[in-house]
Amino acid sequence: MGCTRDAILDALENLTADELKKFKMKLLSVPLREGYGRIPRGTLLPLDAVDLTDKLVSYYLEAYGAELTALVLRDMGMQEVAEQLQETMSKGPRNVLAEVRDPLQKTAKPGLHFVDQHRAALIARVTVVDGVLDALYGKVLTEEQYQAVRAERTSSDKMRKLFSFSPAWNMTCKDLLLQALRDTQPYLVDDLEQS
């Protein structure tokens, strides 16, 4: 899905310096979906189009990052650029924006992912979270997300904070979490798989 990143970058590179500044200011106040954190103002404001694209994708992943970019562009009155972005998305191998608009379609299927199915038990029973975080750092978690989870005091609070980022994850991210849990807490994972 690298085409999504390219589409976001194309849209942002079409903005003038003033429009890019306005985009960043609007991005600071646009309502976000539950589970998504806001990019800090100090981090956001100095970014150019390339770095901003990277930051959008790392914070919101490609699908929601593209939707958010289109939303902010529309809010700025730049319908044409927003439509070009959405058009590029719908021409991709699969319609990324439609996938973002209907995320419940996947979770409504009977085969919930292990980490979704056992969320409550994982929050309550995972005792060593740091090893899990280290495995996810850079692949699933950004530096800010990693530090936010580490800042929590108890293991259950750390797991709860970790799960607060999960609405932005795809199956690969959840598979990486499961693998990290298998590596650090194999007996717990075995017990939950048998329950």
Swiss-Prot record:
CDD domains, A to Z: CARD_ASC_NALP1, Pyrin_ASC-like
Classification via Pfam families: CARD (PF00619), PYRIN (PF02758)
GO molecular function, one term: pattern recognition receptor activity
Domain Pyrin: residue ranges: 1-91
Organism superkingdom: Eukaryota
Gene3D superfamilies referenced in this protein's UniProt entry, alphabetically: Death Domain, Fas (1.10.533.10)
Main location: cytoplasm
Compartment annotation: Cytoplasm; Inflammasome; Endoplasmic reticulum; Mitochondrion
Glycyl lysine isopeptide (Lys-Gly) (interchain with G-Cter in ubiquitin) crosslink residues: K55, K174
UniProt PTM comment: Phosphorylated.
Domain (CARD): residue spans on this chain: 107-195
Function: Functions as a key mediator in apoptosis and inflammation. Promotes caspase-mediated apoptosis involving predominantly caspase-8 and also caspase-9 in a probable cell type-specific manner. Involved in activation of the mitochondrial apoptotic pathway, promotes caspase-8-dependent proteolytic maturation of BID independently of FADD in certain cell types and also mediates mitochondrial translocation of BAX and activates BAX-dependent apoptosis coupled to activation of caspase-9, -2 and -3.
Subunit annotation: Self-associates; enforced oligomerization induces apoptosis, NF-kappa-B regulation and interleukin-1 beta secretion. Homooligomers can form disk-like particles of approximately 12 nm diameter and approximately 1 nm height. Component of several inflammasomes containing one pattern recognition receptor/sensor, such as NLRP1, NLRP2, NLRP3, NLRP6, NLRC4, AIM2, MEFV or NOD2, and probably NLRC4 or NLRP12. Major component of the ASC pyroptosome, a 1-2 um supramolecular assembly (one per macrophage cell) which consists of oligomerized PYCARD dimers and CASP1.
Protein name: Apoptosis-associated speck-like protein containing a CARD
